[in-house]
């Protein structure tokens, strides 16, 4: 019985880690086929992905631009909605919060098809602004949720103390609310960023083959079979996810975001 639990944990770790190890090793293949174990190990595929192959470097640039801009926009849009919901709880605030969460709840293919029709009517189909706006709408629920958690965690006695000292609502917002919710703001931004960086379905419809992100370029490359350069793209996704969630763990209140009870911490 004592041996069963360590063996089970080891099997779980191996089950999760094995695909990652295979992908990382496959990126080292010297040929054009993705083999495991790799043949003629080389870092040439990394050079292709980051430097010499324009289709990959451009796709990476598009992914970074869309993910960063859409995450920032989603966070900015989420702030007034979350603040209004926390401050007043009015029907309008509740309706806006529900509307902000709806795209994330819908099946991505439904949302993607709808956006494709919308952008085609406005003439923005296949443009980078359409991709940024689409991902901002899709991932708005993430910063909205983290900000709602952060605002709910504010100690009301701090607000009362600020009011007693004669602070206006604007001063209270800048000196009390913003500093205490900064970890949740950053968490929402990083969550939206990493999901945007990895998203494929919605971007497939709104890009209309006019440009490619890394996810779209991997899909396009499948026509020529599995290649080591695709494995490099997968490694980039892994590193981006690890970095984003590490930053959330470092600067955000991860236990509270995961639903931990403050009184038990």
Model-flagged regions — what are they?
Residues 1-8, 29, 148-159, 163, ...:
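C-terminal transmembrane helix and the adjacent membrane-cytosol boundary/short C-terminal tail
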Residues 1-2, 68-100, 113-117, 173, ...:
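Transmembrane-helix boundary motif in ABC transporter permease subunits
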Residues 19-31, 62, 112-123, 190-196, ...:
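A structural signal for multi-pass alpha-helical bundles of membrane permease subunits
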Residues 8, 13-20, 112, 137, ...:
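Transmembrane alpha-helices
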Residues 18-53, 204-209, 265:
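Short membrane-interfacial helix/loop motifs at transmembrane-helix boundaries
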Residues 34, 38, 43, 92, ...:
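Membrane-interfacial helix termini and adjacent extracytoplasmic/periplasmic loops
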Residues 58-62, 117-142, 146, 182-189, ...:
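Loop-to-helix entry region at the N-terminal start of transmembrane alpha-helices
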Residues 31, 46-55, 197-254:
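Interhelical loop and adjacent transmembrane-helix boundary motif
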């Amino acid at each position: 019985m004592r041996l069963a639990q360590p063996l089970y944990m080891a099997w779980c770790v191996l089950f999760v880690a094995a695909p990652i190890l295979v992908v990382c090793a496959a990126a080292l293949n010297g040929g054009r086929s993705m083999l495991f174990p790799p043949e003629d190990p080389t870092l040439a595929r990394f050079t292709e992905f980051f430097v010499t192959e324009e289709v990959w470097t451009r796709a990476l640039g598009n992914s970074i631009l869309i993910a960063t801009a859409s995450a920032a926009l989603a966070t900015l849009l989420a702030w007034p909605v979350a603040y209004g919901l926390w401050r007043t709880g009015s029907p309008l605030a509740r309706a806006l919060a529900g509307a902000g969460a709806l795209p994330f709840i819908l099946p991505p293919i439904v949302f993607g098809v709808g956006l494709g029709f919308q952008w085609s009517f406005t003439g923005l189909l296949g443009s980078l602004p359409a991709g940024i706006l689409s991902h901002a709408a899709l991932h708005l629920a993430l910063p909205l949720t983290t900000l709602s958690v952060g605002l709910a965690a504010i100690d009301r006695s701090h607000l009362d103390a600020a009011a007693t000292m004669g602070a206006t609502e604007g001063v209270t917002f800048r000196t009390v609310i913003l500093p205490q919710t900064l970890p949740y703001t950053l968490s929402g931004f990083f969550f939206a960023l990493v999901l945007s960086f990895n998203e494929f379905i919605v971007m497939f419809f709104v890009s209309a083959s006019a440009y490619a992100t890394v996810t779209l370029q991997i899909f396009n490359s499948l026509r020529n079979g599995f290649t080591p350069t695709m494995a490099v793209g997968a490694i980039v996704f892994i590193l981006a996810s690890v970095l984003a969630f590490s930053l959330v763990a470092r600067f955000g209140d991860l236990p509270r975001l995961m639903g931990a009870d403050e009184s038990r911490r």
